[in-house]
A protein has these predicted regions:
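Conserved ABC ATPase signature
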Residues: 4-8, 12
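Hydrophobic anchor residue at the start of the ABC signature
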Residues: 18, 46
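A short, proline-enriched helix->beta-strand linker immediately N-terminal to the Walker B motif
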Residues: 23-27
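A short, surface-exposed alpha-helical micro-motif characterized by mixed small hydrophobic
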Residues: 71-73
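Charged, flexible cofactor/metal-binding loops and thiol motifs
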Residues: 91-159
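Conserved small/polar residues in nucleotide/adenosyl-binding loops
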Residues: 162-168
């Protein structure tokens, strides 16, 4: 039964968009919040579809999201941005369990936890102090590897980040 685009549900529209994108057999796709407007009940099926297609078609995604739970599910590495600049990159579980940059710590602390009795680490970050560092040193900070391919932005302008490459599946 043929339908017009306005007659499709959000999930159907997203599947059509995915099909239109992948019909060209790309090796790399930028996905900017592809599931944010979907109902929670449909979101997981779209993410599973994307992961299965990535594996079957050998395509890599740069998945842009504000939702760290989605990033954890979709990506093997996460790059955190502050004021439009990448401040930390690491394997997903490494970054979520051992954040180093003050903004990453604050971002992780802001994730709501459904169980109020769950005791989690809360990071206290002074955003005025963080903003003053950005103003003082600029926002183009070099990245350094602190081990396990965990990169953080630094204010030491003598460090080069030309060796830094993004992995095949990364969330920003």
């Amino acid at each position: 039964m043929p339908r017009y685009p306005h007659e499709l549900s959000g999930g159907q529209r997203q599947r059509v968009s995915i099909a239109r994108t992948l019909i060209m057999k790309p090796k790399f796709v930028v996905c900017d919040e592809p599931t944010s407007m979907l109902d929670v009940s449909i979101r997981i099926s779209i993410m599973d579809l994307m992961l299965n297609l990535a594996k079957d078609l050998e395509v890599s995604y740069l998945y842009i999201t504000h939702d760290l739970a989605v990033a954890r599910y979709m990506c093997n590495r996460i790059a955190v941005m502050f004021n439009g600049k990448i401040v930390e990159i690491a394997e997903t579980e490494e970054l979520l369990s051992n954040p180093v940059h003050p903004y990453t710590k604050r971002l992780i602390s802001s994730i709501p936890v459904p169980d109020p009795s769950y005791d989690r680490k809360v990071y206290d970050v002074n955003f005025d102090e963080l903003d003053s560092l950005i103003e003082k040193y600029g926002s183009d900070k070099p990245m350094i590897d602190i081990g396990n391919e965990h990169y953080i932005a630094t204010h030491d302008v003598t460090v080069s980040y030309t060796h830094l490459t993004l992995p095949t599946s990364c969330c920003v």
